[in-house]
């Protein structure tokens, strides 16, 4: 019975609890599955994000972004240790540059300056006994006589409640603090002051230090820390001193000692909050270990980094040093504000205001540099690929106008936009134009790859509002395309011109007097060149006019003089013309005038003789009319010849006679042997070679002169005159008929002496044989 009761109890209880237990089990399984699914989804999202930059994120994946390894290794307080040779004094010894300024401002004579210079403590007065082997440990600076292991301790300087600074802190005039470039130079030293001597201006945060008069007489020991410790009085005076000055031979060692002394003056138990406390104002801004490892991995990631590894390492190291400072934040903030002011926002968004800037974790990387152009004029073009994945984040505030329709009132909502630049890469072009350009122009050669992550925040909660994010993304891409893609370029000024008359260029030094002298010299040179050119042109023009007058004087001789004399005279005239032209080219005015004067006299006399002969021998009107027509035609020909001669170069050869320009009588109807009794005695063979010319009715004299091949003889002027004197009826008849013809002058410059030779041959045949 007992077993039956137990069975019934178990059965009843099991039936009641079975369904709840099953439901509870299913619920637990569902929760476990949901947790596993969400975990796998997060891991998948994390892996997807890491795939974007898997190579650069692989080693730095599990490191805390804020971890700084150097901060853990830094030695502070009593743990600081350093040693080396230094020179220590209780009084400040002035540098030679400071002494020169002091003497200049003293306004004394030379004797007073010499005496004053002897009173001032100078660096050249430092002695060997002031040089010690210093050991920094346990928060104290121990000074030894030498660096041996058993060296005697001379002095010990406690660094607790001490202010360490670079001295002098101000320039030679004592008005402005030294620039950072002059802190670690031969002029400066390290000063150790007691905190009681130093104060700080709470308003401007300026350090107020004790003032030292260079004319103050030195102490009894001249500021020395003597190695002779026999007198207790001197030891007491030394330990009660409030300042020490440390001089170093090496400026780089001076920097190391400066940082070590500051760290040694730190006290971990100090509760002070003043700015003079090194625990407050002298905490080193160590680099983030994750960012430093990422930089090391980036510059060794690909083959393209080999040529620019040094550049990327330098830029990355400088970026990480400024990453936590306000200087870089302000610089980027200013640049972004200028760019945002140029962006046209959508109609439903107000102006964009930058509230916060996070510079990211890395600097841009530059790869594949290429020199495209470097000209002698100075034009320079450099192409390089740039890649940025530093996660620069900007918080922008604006207002959005939300319109939900006519039934609802339009509302304005304040927005905060978180814009993160995940990637910004492309081929970059740098351009430096020839002088006077003073800036570097840069732009992307093609549209860069841009990956923005924009998240609007309303009432401190993130919203997924695609209309706003897409509009802002498109506006950012449009702004980049319109300002940083070729042909649109931005610039970096490397030489500012705030005080220049003409801004935006590199000009030569301004010297108005020198510029005026240069312009005067250039104007005088141009004037001399112009006057010389005009003088030469005038001489050439005078020579051409002289040559024209000579040619005009030659015309009557060609008409009236004997052909042979005319040729000789023309040769002389041409030679004279040539000599005159050459003389003109060489600017010999005297010789040119003499030659032209002689030529004019010679031809003037010749023309007078020709005129007298013309009056005596030519009397009929028909000849005069014909000669007038010939003169008119000759004048036209001469004018055209003068025009051609002005265009063509001057020829120096003798002119050729084309026509004898004299009247030719009609051919008699009787045979030629009956014209004169001189021909009766000729043999028959002498006249066989002279065929009977055609009659006058068939051929006139002009055709006879024009057809040179058929012309075999001519009548000279002497024969015609003899015929007239002898009373030849045929010649007189021809004289009365006045049948005359002339051949017009051609444009040839050479004289064809064929006619002259034929006349000579004909005269020889007509002469009687003795």
From Swiss-Prot:
Stretches with biased composition (Basic and acidic residues): 554-566, 679-688, 756-770
GO molecular function, one term: lipid transporter activity
Modified residues (Phosphoserine): 640, 669, 717, 720, 723
Protein keywords: Endoplasmic reticulum, Glycoprotein, Lipid transport, Lipid-binding, Membrane, Nucleus, Phosphoprotein, Signal-anchor, Transmembrane, Transmembrane helix, Transport
SUPFAM superfamilies: PH domain-like
Cytoplasmic topological domain: 1-5
Phenotype seen when the gene is deleted: Leads to abnormal cellular complex sphingolipid levels. Simultaneous knockout of SVF1 to leads to myriocin sensitivity (sphingosine biosynthesis inhibitor).
Domain PH: 114-266
Lumenal domain ranges by topology: 27-770
Domain SMP-LTD: 304-504
Membrane topology per record: Single-pass type II membrane protein
One CC-aspect GO term: nucleus-vacuole junction
Sequence intervals crossing the membrane: 6-26
Example GO biological process: ER to Golgi ceramide transport
Main location: endoplasmic reticulum
Region spans: Disordered: 541-566, 578-600, 615-770
Chain intervals with Polar residues compositional bias: 587-596, 713-725, 736-751
Pfam family name, one: MMM1
Glycosylation sites: 228, 263, 279, 300, 391, 528-529, 595, 620, 700, 718
Signal sequence, renumbered to the chain: none
Subcellular localization(s) per the UniProt record: Endoplasmic reticulum membrane; Nucleus membrane
Miscellaneous comment: Present with 36500 molecules/cell in log phase SD medium.
Notes concerning its domains: The SMP-LTD domain is a barrel-like domain that can bind various types of glycerophospholipids in its interior and mediate their transfer between two adjacent bilayers.
Function summary: During endoplasmic reticulum (ER) stress or when cellular ceramide levels increase, induces contacts between the ER and medial-Golgi complex to facilitate non-vesicular transport of ceramides from the ER to the Golgi complex where they are converted to complex sphingolipids, preventing toxic ceramide accumulation.
Protein name per UniProt: Nucleus-vacuole junction protein 2
Name of the gene encoding the protein in the UniProt record: NVJ2
């Amino acid at each position: 019975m007992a077993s039956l009761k137990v069975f019934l109890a178990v059965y009843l209880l099991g039936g009641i609890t079975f369904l709840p237990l099953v439901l509870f089990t299913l619920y637990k399984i569902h929760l476990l599955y949901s947790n596993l699914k969400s975990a796998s989804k997060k891991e998948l999202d994390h892996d997807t994000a890491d795939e974007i930059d898997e190579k650069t994120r692989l080693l730095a994946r599990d490191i805390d972004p804020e971890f700084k390894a150097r901060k853990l290794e830094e030695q502070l307080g009593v743990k600081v240790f350093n040693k080396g040779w230094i020179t220590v004094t209780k009084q400040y010894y002035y540098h030679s540059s400071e002494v020169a300024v002091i003497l200049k401002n003293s306004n004394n004579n030379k004797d007073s300056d010499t005496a004053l210079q002897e009173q001032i403590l100078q660096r050249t007065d430092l002695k060997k006994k002031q040089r010690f082997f210093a050991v920094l440990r346990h928060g104290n600076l121990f000074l030894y006589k030498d660096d041996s292991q058993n060296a005697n301790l001379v002095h010990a300087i406690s660094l607790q409640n001490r202010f360490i600074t670079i001295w002098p802190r101000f320039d030679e005039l004592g008005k402005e603090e030294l620039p950072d470039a002059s802190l670690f130079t031969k002029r400066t030293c390290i000063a150790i002051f007691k905190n009681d001597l130093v104060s700080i201006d709470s308003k401007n945060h300026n350090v107020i230090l004790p003032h030292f008069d260079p004319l103050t007489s030195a102490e009894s020991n001249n500021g020395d820390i003597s190695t002779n410790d026999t007198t207790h009085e001197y030891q007491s005076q030394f330990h009660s001193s409030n300042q020490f000055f440390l001089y170093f031979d090496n400026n780089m060692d001076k920097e190391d000692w400066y940082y070590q002394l500051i760290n040694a003056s730190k006290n971990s138990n100090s509760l002070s909050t003043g700015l003079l406390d090194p625990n407050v104002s002298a905490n080193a801004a160590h680099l983030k270990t994750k960012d430093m490892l990422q930089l090391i991995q980036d510059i060794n990631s690909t083959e393209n980094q080999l040529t620019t590894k040094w550049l990327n390492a330098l830029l990355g190291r400088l970026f990480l040093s400024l990453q936590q400072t306000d200087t870089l934040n302000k610089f980027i903030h200013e640049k972004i504000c200028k760019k945002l002011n140029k962006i046209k926002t959508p109609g439903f968004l107000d102006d964009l205001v930058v509230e916060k800037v996070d510079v990211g974790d890395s600097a841009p990387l530059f790869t594949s540099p290429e020199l495209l152009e470097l000209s002698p004029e100075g034009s320079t073009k450099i192409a390089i690929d740039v890649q940025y994945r530093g996660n620069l984040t900007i918080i922008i505030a604006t207002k959005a106008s939300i319109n939900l329709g006519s039934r609802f009132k339009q509302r304005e909502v304040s927005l905060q936009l978180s814009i993160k630049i995940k990637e910004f890469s492309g081929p970059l072009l740098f351009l430096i134009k020839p002088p006077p350009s003073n800036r570097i122009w840069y732009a992307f050669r093609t549209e860069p790859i841009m990956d923005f992550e924009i998240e609007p925040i309303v009432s401190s909660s993130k919203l997924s509002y695609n209309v706003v994010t897409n509009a802002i993304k498109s506006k950012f891409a449009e702004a980049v395309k319109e300002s940083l893609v070729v042909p649109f370029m931005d610039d970096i000024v490397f030489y500012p011109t705030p005080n220049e008359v003409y801004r935006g260029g590199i000009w030569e030094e301004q010297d108005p007097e020198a510029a005026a002298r240069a312009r005067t010299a250039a104007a005088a040179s141009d004037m001399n060149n112009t006057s010389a050119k005009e003088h030469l042109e005038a001489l050439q023009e005078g020579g051409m006019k002289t040559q024209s007058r000579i040619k005009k004087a030659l015309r009557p001789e060609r008409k009236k003089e004997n052909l042979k004399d005319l040729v000789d005279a023309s040769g002389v005239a041409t030679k004279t013309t040539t000599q005159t032209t050459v003389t003109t080219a060489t600017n010999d005015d005297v010789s040119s005038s003499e030659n032209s004067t002689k030529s004019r006299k010679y031809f003037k006399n010749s023309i007078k003789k020709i005129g007298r002969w013309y009056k005596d021998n030519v009397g009929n009107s028909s000849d005069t009319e014909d000669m007038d027509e010939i003169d008119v035609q000759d004048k036209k020909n001469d004018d055209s010849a003068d025009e051609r001669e002005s265009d063509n170069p001057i020829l120096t050869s003798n002119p050729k006679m084309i026509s004898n320009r004299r009247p030719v009588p009609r051919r008699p109807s009787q045979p030629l042997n009956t014209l004169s009794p001189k021909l009766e005695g000729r043999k028959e063979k002498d006249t066989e070679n002279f065929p009977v010319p055609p009659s006058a009715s068939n051929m006139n004299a002009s055709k006879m002169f024009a057809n040179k091949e058929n012309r075999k003889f001519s009548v000279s002027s002497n024969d015609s005159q003899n015929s007239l004197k002898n009373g030849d009826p045929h010649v007189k008849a021809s004289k009365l008929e006045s049948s005359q013809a002339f051949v017009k002058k051609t444009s040839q410059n050479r004289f064809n002496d064929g006619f002259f030779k034929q006349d000579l041959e004909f005269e020889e045949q007509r002469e009687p044989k003795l």
